[in-house]
Design a protein with these regions (language model features):
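General "foldedness" signal
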Residues: 19, 26-28, 68, 96
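Generic structural signal for short, solvent-exposed loop/turn connectors between secondary structure elements
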Residues: 9, 27, 43-49
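Conserved nucleotidyltransferase catalytic core and NTase-mimicking acidic/glycine-rich helix/loop elements
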Residues: 46-168
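Histidine (H) residue identity feature
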Residues: 19, 36-39, 68, 84
């Protein structure tokens, strides 16, 4: 539900949404977008290059995109993962050891992983820092999750530029 345009040479995504003061007032899913932007704007700036690396790595591995057909990593998910782990390398090392039901709760909304797993059943659970009732990784399929872990393991064993280039 967004418009992609090129404005003065920049690729821009325009996301229409309702102006709401909290996520409790949302009328549709994209109403979260301003909350996500505000949450990340200052925190993610020093990690920008790491975010771009992860997004390109996911594109290269065919696991980027949260649409139904791809079932992969969204851009926001990539940003939160880099923020949580503090960089691309740190995230890749952690991801290479992920198991089904991995829980990441950046804001510490829940007392323990068990209580989170009682609410969510997806392979990767990343609690949205702006909406504790939402798993940012809900669109990630078990297949894409497994593929990503394998890619991360391979990359950690032998890093290379080939991981960042999508198959033609």
């Amino acid at each position: 539900p967004y418009l992609n345009a090129v404005i003065e040479g920049y690729d821009v995504d325009l996301v229409p949404c309702y102006h709401v003061s909290s996520t409790a007032e949302m009328k549709c899913a994209v109403d979260r977008t301003p909350f996500h932007t505000r949450y990340l704007i200052d925190k993610i700036a020093p990690l920008r290059e790491d975010v771009l690396l992860l997004k390109q790595f996911c594109k290269g591995g065919g696991v980027y995109g949260s649409d139904h057909m791809t079932g992969g990593f969204s851009g926001y998910l990539c940003e939160l993962l880099i923020l949580h782990y503090g960089g691309f390398t740190q995230f890749m090392e952690a991801a290479s050891k992920f198991r089904y039901g991995e829980v990441i709760d950046i804001e510490g909304y829940y007392p323990d992983r068990k209580s989170v797993r009682a609410l969510f059943t997806e392979p990767l659970i990343v609690i949205d820092p702006t909406d504790k009732s939402r798993n940012v990784a809900a669109a990630l399929t078990p297949t894409r999750f497994s593929e990503f872990i394998e890619l991360a393991r391979d990359y950690c064993e032998k890093p290379g530029s080939c991981y960042f280039i999508p198959d033609a």
